[in-house]
Amino acid sequence: MNRRALISVSDKTGVVDFARGLADLGFEIVSTGGTYQTIKAAGVPVTYVTEITGFPEILDGRVKTLHPKVHGGILARRTPEHLAQLEAHAIVPIDVVAVNLYPFRETVAKPGVTREEAVENIDIGGPAMVRASAKNHESVAIIVNPDRYATVLAELQQNGVVSEATRRALAREAFAHTAEYDAAIAAYLAAEAGDDDPFAGIFAPGKVEKVQDLRYGENPHQKAAFYRERGYRGAGAGTAKQRWGKELSFNNLLDLNAALELVREFDRPAAAIIKHNNPCGVAVAATLKEAYEKAFAADPVSAFGGIIAFNVAVDADTANEVVKTFMEAVIAPSFDEAALEILQQKKGLRIMETGPLADSAPATADVKKIRGGFLVQEADLGDVTAEQIQVVTERAPEEGELADLLFAWKVVKHVKSNAIVIAKDGVAIGVGAGQMNRVGSAQIALEQAKASRAFGGDSVDHNNPAQGAVLASDAFLPFKDTVETAARYGIRAIIQPGGSVRDAESIEACNRLGVAMVFTGMRHFKH
C-alpha cells in the first residue's frame, strides 16, 4: 500500500515541488480546493479529498475534511489494534500532513473588512487537522511552514522516514501555529465588540492569566493591569502572596521585582531598598536586622518611601526597624508571626511573602516591548568568583577588599547603566545610576558614599566613608578619569569588565595611585 500525504494550504509557496517530491517517493497525494487545483495544474498526480471520504464538500466549503476517513487516517497509532480498525473501515493511514490556515490576520488587516469576511476566514477544518497530526506526531509529520518542506523531503529521501526529533519539532510548531491563530481571532472579536480592556489580545490565550486591573500605570493617566505567567510556581514578585496592606500599584510591582532579584544574589542575610527600580541601599550582614540598618543608613533620604526586600525570613527585631520609617512595601520569603504583627501596625504597608527563594527555577528569558515587536534575551545570570577575576595592577586587592569587590559586582548588575557602585564592609554606600557618561555616575556614587551614615562614628573616617571603599563599574572604564576621581575619594580597589582600548591608561593610573584593579571579562549593562 502506498503511503498517503494530505496537503491543504492557503500559502502555496513551494507546494508543487513538495507534492512532486512526495509523489516521486511513492506517496499518494490527497488535497482540497485551490491546493488540489494548483498541484493538478502542475501535472503532479493528486486525489481530491471527496474521493476518499465519499462525501461532498458542503455548506459553501465549510465542511471538507471533517470526516472519519481523514481524521481516522491521521489519528491512528501504528498499532495492530488501530490498524485493524482502519482496515475494517477502509481507512488508509496518513503519514504526512501539510496544512496552513486561512489568512485571518491578513484579512482583518485590510481596510474596511466586514465582519462577515472576517468570520468566513476563521478556519475550522485546518486547525482540526493540524492539531490531530501534532497529537499523533509519533506517526505523522505535520508541516505548517513551507520552509520545512525541504527538511521533510530530505529525510524521506535519505531515510525513508521523518526522524522522531523532526516530528517532535514540527508538532511544537504546529501547536504554536494554531495557538497564534486562535489568539488573533480572539483579539479581533474583542476589539470588534468594543471590549474596554486595552490589553485584550496582547498575550496568547493560556500563556498568562489576568490577576487584576491596576489603579493606573507608571503615571495616573496610563491604564495598567497585572498578568501572571501560567504554570510558574517559583518564588517571585509575580507569584508572591499579599499578607497585608493597600492594593499594589504598577510601580510597586516593578520595584518589588527589582528588589527581590537583587537580594537573590546573596547567601548571607541581605537587605535591599529600591527606589524607581534602582537600589539606594544594599547590605549583607550576620543578622537581617544589621543588614537592614546598614542598607537604610547608606542613604536614608532616598530610602524614605522605598521598597524593601529580604532574602531570609523577617524576624521581630528587623520588623521593629522597618516600621520606624514610611515604606511602600516589603517582600521576603516569610515573616515570623511576631514580625507580621509589628509590620501590620503600618496600615498602608504592603507585605508580600514569596516562599523560599531556593525553590525558584532560574529565570530564563528577559522580554522587553518595543513598538511593533518584542525583544527577547537570556536573563543576565552571569557572576564571577574570586578564582575567575583577573588582577591587572601591581597591587592585588586585600582579602576584605576582594570580598567587597565581589559584593559590589553583584549589586552593580541591578543598577541602570551607566552604573557605578561604591561598597564597604558589605554595604553599598554609593550608587550612581543612569548617567550618560561613566565618570558622571562615578561622581554621583562617590558623593553619596562620602555622605553615607552606614557606619556612623564607628567608621575608619566617618567624615568620609568612601575612604578605603571599593568601586564596581557595570562596563569598562573608557578613560582613566574614573580611576583618578575615585582615588581622590579614597577608593582602594576597582572591579570592572575590562576591554577598553584605553585599559592600559586606567591600569597605569591605578598603579600610580596605589589602587588595585581586577577585570571580570563580563559586562552587566541594564537598560
Swiss-Prot record:
Which reactions is this enzyme annotated as catalysing? (6R)-10-formyltetrahydrofolate + 5-amino-1-(5-phospho-beta-D-ribosyl)imidazole-4-carboxamide = 5-formamido-1-(5-phospho-D-ribosyl)imidazole-4-carboxamide + (6S)-5,6,7,8-tetrahydrofolate; IMP + H2O = 5-formamido-1-(5-phospho-D-ribosyl)imidazole-4-carboxamide
- Endpoints of the signal sequence: none
Keyword terms: Hydrolase, Multifunctional enzyme, Purine biosynthesis, Transferase
**Might you report a single GO cellular component term?**
cytosol
MGS-like domain residues are: 1-144
GO terms under biological process: 'de novo' IMP biosynthetic process
Q: In which pathway does it act?
A: Purine metabolism; IMP biosynthesis via de novo pathway; 5-formamido-1-(5-phospho-D-ribosyl)imidazole-4-carboxamide from 5-amino-1-(5-phospho-D-ribosyl)imidazole-4-carboxamide (10-formyl THF route): step 1/1; Purine metabolism; IMP biosynthesis via de novo pathway; IMP from 5-formamido-1-(5-phospho-D-ribosyl)imidazole-4-carboxamide: step 1/1
The EC code for this enzyme is 2.1.2.3, 3.5.4.10
**Gene3D superfamilies assigned to the protein according to its UniProt record, in alphabetical order:** 3.40.140.20, Methylglyoxal synthase-like domain
Q: Which GO terms describe its molecular function?
A: IMP cyclohydrolase activity; phosphoribosylaminoimidazolecarboxamide formyltransferase activity
Q: What is known of its domains?
A: The IMP cyclohydrolase activity resides in the N-terminal region.
Question: Sorted alphabetically, which HAMAP family does this protein's record hold?
Answer: PurH
Protein family (similarity comment) = Belongs to the PurH family.
Task: Return the protein name.
Answer: Bifunctional purine biosynthesis protein PurH
